[in-house]
């Protein structure tokens, strides 16, 4: 079993995945809205490079108020046409991702940029959305809780802290807790490229402290200050920004 996160339509990276490692677990964010390194993504295709570069700078400055106003301005003309272009691009990206993964056994949870409705429409038969469920694999109990942390951006895949907490409570005791976003620890949630604290779950940190799983696996923060952290007896691991690094975490490396 191998784990990846933040594919963000990285088709070249997907083509490098080994096919002899067992099931593939995807911890969210299959499509690419904006790549904050170079501006590539759906937003650039629809609104143009200049606008996206400005949006990136506003995010780096943490100016969500101006960013929100800019989004409103961008949609002020030809709104329906732009929304349709975005919708079409989302469908296309999911279809291309799932086409490459057709020969894998895939378990996934949604991330903050994912459109759950379109994901469900486009996923192939070999793909299981395991959000909110427990999986027993090789005598290891995995718990899965997807969704993005709520932010001023209000992305498609965001859920409330209370909704996420409820998911965790229903999972109960697990050996490995798998989420999209990390527990709320400064070193795990601070991105050195966007120059800000990204999102993290307070309830996940509490879950780890009380339930004491052996591992916490996640993604979401692309370039964190720390990729690994210890909370009590639990080792927390960011499995990597797959679009950029093509990296994956092999279950065997955890030596459970």
Give the positions of each predicted feature.
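Histidine-centered catalytic micro-motifs
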Residues: 6-7, 178-183, 213-224
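Short acidic, glycine-rich surface-loop motifs adjacent to enzyme active sites
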Residues: 31, 40, 171-190
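A short helix->loop->beta-strand "cap" motif at the edges of active sites that frequently abuts
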Residues: 101-106, 211-214, 232-234
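Binuclear metal-dependent phosphoesterase catalytic core
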Residues: 134-139, 156, 206-210, 224-256
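Binuclear metal-dependent hydrolase catalytic cores centered on His/Asp/Glu-rich metal-binding motifs
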Residues: 140-176, 194-205
